[in-house]
């Protein structure tokens, strides 16, 4: 008769063996894996869905139409709490029930919003719009396991922290919300989207200041390209317009002090004086090319390259010579396997700061040399403001839509330039994107801490 200890040991061992055999069977059946690429090959990655929650409105086509018409979502700040701050404009997502307005209850039940921060709610909305736009609603366990989420957040809403700190100090421990920590975790947007749509592939979150959205899309591109997923729901979200955050950016001398909301953000302009803070969420559905073709998906564009670099210089200021931006763009071009002369459009990071716009302009000229005077460069931030952690994802979406519609979005408010800003910045009005060969673009994102990313996106 076996001892009690030996019987327990055998039961535990048997359970582990059964579990191991079960896992091996699932792996053999490929039920929980994306399709692996052939050795030495990289899978093609296309954009099949776009969801936008921006100061220009909510949706995809509606936002694009407003962008190319030259509309702006920047408005004046209202409220006594902003009176002491030398910034009087911002770019809010329009709230309401009319077309193009954001009504969070269309996406999240009111009972659930108490456990979420505003950027998480916006990310849920943008993801739902993107998945619907892509026509991708995985139901089988295999499809769910092959679909991942990577939605970044540049910074949590500071008022969530400050208000909770005040509550704790004045009312004590028992009044602190049990949802406080989930509200301030930057990965919770990815988590909530994964939970709501049962997406069990890679679950990833990026927080790299204003480069967040581009890094999330770029990382997702590589997840799909290298077989970690067949589909990625990727993007960025930020909603932190508040007196405290505005005060912080203003003290860093990053914000525009222009009081006119229609001209405050003017990338590449001689009188640019800082960025305009915005909010929103942008999510793209990235998909392995053959996977998209098999299901008959509409394809906006293809991501063909991704580059990253670090300035290693200053905590907030860019490298004045644009070296980090140059290396980042060069890395994306190399990753795409193309020549710089094949690029015909750049969606610039250009936030309307004196240093940043000048550095990016230098980097473009350094990389493209004479070809710089042939390509088009525009910044869409004159229309949206600077969406912080959302910016890179929103601008990747705009670049994909530019490829799809063959139209270049304008740089608003650019009615004059300085002598060394002598490129085609698509001033004031949208332009037709004329190209002899494939339409290929770069979209740049640069952030505090010297973090840089460039995506190379091409038409089909």
Swiss-Prot record:
Positions annotated as active site in the UniProt record: 210 (for beta-ketoacyl synthase activity), 349 (for beta-ketoacyl synthase activity), 386 (for beta-ketoacyl synthase activity)
N6-acetyllysine PTM positions: 110, 175
PROSITE patterns: KS3_1, KS3_2
GO CC list: mitochondrion
GO molecular function: 3-oxoacyl-[acyl-carrier-protein] synthase activity
Post-translational modification N6-succinyllysine, affected residues: 110, 114, 175
Activity control summary: Inhibited by cerulenin.
Key word Mitochondrion present: yes
Pathway: Lipid metabolism; fatty acid biosynthesis
E.C. numbers: 2.3.1.41
Compartment list: Mitochondrion
Gene Ontology biological process: fatty acid biosynthetic process
Catalytic reaction list: a fatty acyl-[ACP] + malonyl-[ACP] + H(+) = a 3-oxoacyl-[ACP] + holo-[ACP] + CO2; butanoyl-[ACP] + malonyl-[ACP] + H(+) = 3-oxohexanoyl-[ACP] + holo-[ACP] + CO2; hexanoyl-[ACP] + malonyl-[ACP] + H(+) = 3-oxooctanoyl-[ACP] + holo-[ACP] + CO2; octanoyl-[ACP] + malonyl-[ACP] + H(+) = 3-oxodecanoyl-[ACP] + holo-[ACP] + CO2
Transferase among keywords: yes
Protein origin, superkingdom: Eukaryota
Annotated Gene3D superfamilies: 3.40.47.10
Pfam family, one: ketoacyl-synt
Presequence extent in this chain: 1-28
Keywords recorded for this protein, A-Z: Acetylation, Acyltransferase, Fatty acid biosynthesis, Fatty acid metabolism, Lipid biosynthesis, Lipid metabolism, Mitochondrion, Transferase, Transit peptide
Family designation: Belongs to the thiolase-like superfamily. Beta-ketoacyl-ACP synthases family.
Stated role: May play a role in the biosynthesis of lipoic acid as well as longer chain fatty acids required for optimal mitochondrial function.
Name this polypeptide is given: 3-oxoacyl-[acyl-carrier-protein] synthase, mitochondrial
Organism: Bos taurus
Gene: OXSM
């Amino acid at each position: 008769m076996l001892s009690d200890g030996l019987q327990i040991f055998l039961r535990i061992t048997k359970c582990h063996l059964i579990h191991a055999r079960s896992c091996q069977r699932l792996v053999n059946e490929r039920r929980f894996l994306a399709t692996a690429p052939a050795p030495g090959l990289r899978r093609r990655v296309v954009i099949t869905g776009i969801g936008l929650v921006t100061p220009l409105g909510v949706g995809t086509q509606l936002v694009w139409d407003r962008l190319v018409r030259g509309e702006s979502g920047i408005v004046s700040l209202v409220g006594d709490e902003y009176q002491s701050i030398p910034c009087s404009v911002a770019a809010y997502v329009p709230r309401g029930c009319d077309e193009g307005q954001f009504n969070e209850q269309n996406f999240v039940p009111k009972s659930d919003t108490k456990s979420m921060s505003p950027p998480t709610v916006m990310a849920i909305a943008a993801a739902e719009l993107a998945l619907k736009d892509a026509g991708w609603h995985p139901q089988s366990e295999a499809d769910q396991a092959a679909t991942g989420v990577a939605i970044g957040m540049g910074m949590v809403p500071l008022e969530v922290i400050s208000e909770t700190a005040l509550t704790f100090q004045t009312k004590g421990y028992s009044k602190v919300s049990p949802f406080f920590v989930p509200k301030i975790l930057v990965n919770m947007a990815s988590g909530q989207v994964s939970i709501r749509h049962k997406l069990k592939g890679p679950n990833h979150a990026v927080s790299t200041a204003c480069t967040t959205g581009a890094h999330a899309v770029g990382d997702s591109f590589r997840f799909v390209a290298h077989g970690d997923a067949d589909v990625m729901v990727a993007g960025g979200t930020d909603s932190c317009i508040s007196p405290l955050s505005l005060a912080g950016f203003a003290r860093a001398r990053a914000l525009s002090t222009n009081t006119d909301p229609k001209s405050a953000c003017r990338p590449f302009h001689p009188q640019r004086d800082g960025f305009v803070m915005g909010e929103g969420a942008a999510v793209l559905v990235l998909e392995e090319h053959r996977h998209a073709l098999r299901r008959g998906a509409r394809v906006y564009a293809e991501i063909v390259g991704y580059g990253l670099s670090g300035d290693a210089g200053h905590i907030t200021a860019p490298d004045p010579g644009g070296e980090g931006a140059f290396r980042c763009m060069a890395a994306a071009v190399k990753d795409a396997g193309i020549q710089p002369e094949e690029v015909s459009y750049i969606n610039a990071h250009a936030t309307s700061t004196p240093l940043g716009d000048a550095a990016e302009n230098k980097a473009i000229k350094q990389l493209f040399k004479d070809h710089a005077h042939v390509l088009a460069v525009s910044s869409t931030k004159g229309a949206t403001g600077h969406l912080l952690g959302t910016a890179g994802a929103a601008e990747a979406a705009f670049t994909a839509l530019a490829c799809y519609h063959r139209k270049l979005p304008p740089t608003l408010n650019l009615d004059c330039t300085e002598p060394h800003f002598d490129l085609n910045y698509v001033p004031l009005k949208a332009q037709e994107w004329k190209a002899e060969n494939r339409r290929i673009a770069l979209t740049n994102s640069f952030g505090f801490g010297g973090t840089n990313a460039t995506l190379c996106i091409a038409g089909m």
